Amino acid sequence: MVGRGELTDRAWAAIAPLLPPVSGGGRRWRDHRQVINAILWKLRTGAPWRDLPERYGPWKTAHERLRLWTKDGTWARILDEVIVKDDSVGDVEWVISVDSSVVRAHQHSAGARKKGAARPKSTLAVDGEGLGRSRGGLSTKIHLAVDGRGLPMRVVLTAGQAGDNPQLLPLLDGIRVRRDGPGRPRSRPDVVIADKAYSHPSTRQALRRRGITFVSPERTDQIAQRAAKGARGGRPPAFDTELYKQRNVVERCFNRLKQFRDLATRYAKRVAYYQAELTIAAIVLWLR
């Protein structure tokens, strides 16, 4: 019997072939499905690892599996393959909506041990782990790109006070969907929809060069500056009001992601682990 929040039989059948074999050279793995369900329990509840129910096995095993598969890229590969499968049957809608959301970081997320060479100093991050410090405390910003159905295509993490517009092109550059057969990976959406925070002339120009339709309203100050120049201000950029209404899919995706309490508040010390947790949640959304 499948417990609440655990992998369904259908979801397990989809990802099982993408996991390392349970038995092989070296020590035998603990059952993958049990361990993944343990990680999902942690994401759903936001509880400490040591509170993991006994039915999921030792908490150290689940924690180590999360660490190991984060390091070797297993979670990212699973998400990529799930998206490839949907795209091969035409289910991925290449109308991309982007937005960001700030999450409060728990005090325990700070103080990750530094290993190796000193981390580069940044005015936007604390210890280089995607943590920003402000009067409200520590925070991380999630920059998200979703397809036309509101399913996550790409996530970028920054410190909480980082701007939105500088992350738009990195978000799009990270979208590469391999073909299920011959052909180059698809990386260019048909349309990108974003709010006023992304309305910048350089952004519009960059997307125009890529042949991407950009739907974003002008900011009030941009309208005023253009009006002040009179005829030299040029024409306003095209704006499709009906298409812009579809932008709410990215807000709904954030709502679904934050149903996982471990994501609604960041507890992970390492930004790589928080990114992995977001990737796992994205896999769950794609498999629903």
Language-model-derived ranges and their functions:
Residues M1-R288:
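Short alpha-helical elements
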